[in-house]
């Protein structure tokens, strides 16, 4: 299969973290102890929203200390807590604007055949969903990650992998 999805944790009590293809981390709501075995493989972290089961400040801080070149992708509302609480340098944060630029394609992993886009999700706080596209290789395909939402855009049919978390 072209996509390998490892669910590190997906429960409200233990937090949420999903590793796609062994190096794309979606959400970081788990303890450092749970994430540490995967930390050196992660190349990019996608954050959805501020709730603690998706955004564990202590774990993000430790991940940033352990992997100082690692970058975090998020919407504008998460920049302040990333910088002030998790102590992630501003230059390590990649900003997406799902409400202003829905579907805009980003090439955050330069030199690869992987692109991604974000979309707005309905929740009680600002929330972002992600679409990752692998255009090259033997098995190209597209995956979506959405969490804690009341609906998924109808514009998301025809994907190869749907990762939907809700608890």
Task: Say what each PLM segment does.
Residues 19, 35-40, 81-87, 153-158:
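Short loop/helix-cap segments at secondary-structure boundaries that form the rim of catalytic
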Residues 14, 33, 51-55, 79-81, ...:
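Active-site environment of divalent metal-dependent phosphoester hydrolases
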Residues 1-40, 128-148, 161:
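Conserved beta-strand hairpin/beta-sheet module of binuclear metal-dependent hydrolase folds
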Residues 156-167:
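Cap/insert and terminal regions of metallo-dependent hydrolase folds
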Residues 31-78:
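Active-site metal-binding motif and surrounding structural segment of the metallo-beta-lactamase
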Residues 74-140:
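Metallo-beta-lactamase
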Residues 22, 42, 67, 90, ...:
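Short, well-ordered alpha-helix to beta-strand connector turns
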């Amino acid at each position: 299969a072209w996509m390998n999805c490892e669910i590190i944790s997906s429960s409200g009590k233990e937090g949420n973290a999903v590793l796609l293809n062994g190096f794309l981390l979606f959400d970081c709501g788990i303890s450092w102890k749970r994430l540490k075995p995967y930390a050196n493989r992660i190349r990019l972290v996608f954050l959805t929203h501020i709730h603690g089961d998706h955004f564990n400040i202590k774990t993000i801080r430790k991940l940033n200390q352990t992997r100082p070149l690692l970058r975090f992708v998020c919407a504008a509302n998460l920049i302040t807590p990333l910088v002030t609480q998790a102590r992630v340098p501003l230059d390590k944060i990649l900003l997406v604007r799902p409400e202003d630029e829905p579907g805009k394609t980003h090439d955050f992993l330069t030199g690869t055949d992987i692109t991604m886009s974000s979309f707005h999700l309905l929740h009680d706080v600002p929330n972002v969903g992600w679409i990752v596209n692998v255009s090259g290789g033997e098995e190209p395909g597209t995956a979506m990650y959405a969490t804690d939402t009341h609906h998924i855009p109808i514009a998301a049919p025809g994907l190869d992998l749907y990762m939907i978390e809700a608890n």
